[in-house]
Amino acid sequence: DALPISFAAPLASSLLVIESIERFDAPKTAITTLLAGVVAGGVASWIFPMNPYFHMDAIVPGMTFGGQVKLFLLLAAVISIFGKLFSITTLQVKRIYPAIKHPEYVKMLYLLFIAFLISMAEFNLTGGGEQFLLSQAMHPDTHILWIVGMMLLHLVFSIFSFSSGLPGGNFIPTLVTGGLLGQIVALIMVRQGLIAYENISYIMLICMSAFLVAV
């Protein structure tokens, strides 16, 4: 199970359990997924005792129960909208990309050149982008427009890379996009006085997993 292995967190698979019940009404699949998540999380914690995600201080906002419900409903709405847009855009690009009348190696060179340009602006944003996400989670930048630009840059490049048919998946890039989206939402909430600065990483963690499931 990918989520527990990535975060060494057995309860991370509970998101996929909920999805299995809600979408497919498959209790057996849900139970199997939950057990797989517990085993995968245990094995990952045993083999890799040091997890970089453990350095993220996820401090829960000091809210009432009603305030937390409103927060989660807001995050659910934002994640659902952006997740749907991400899925639609990816499908459209996968249809358009093969129609580009250039040899395959030329298309690959285009992506390589774009990756080089991105690395000149922000080196850690290339690849999966998890190093950039971790740095933002531990020391969040407060410039919203810059984070929006980095998220859109990473999002567009990830969509074209995934649509190109190159080996590799979109698991880590999707997590990074969700985390950066969560950072943007959290920064807006900080400016509105709804949460504190130290709660940003908490919102980012929630949005990372939620965006992955939404997509």
Q: Which positions does each model-derived feature cover?
A:
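Alpha-helical transmembrane segments and immediately membrane-proximal extracytoplasmic
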Residues: 1-215
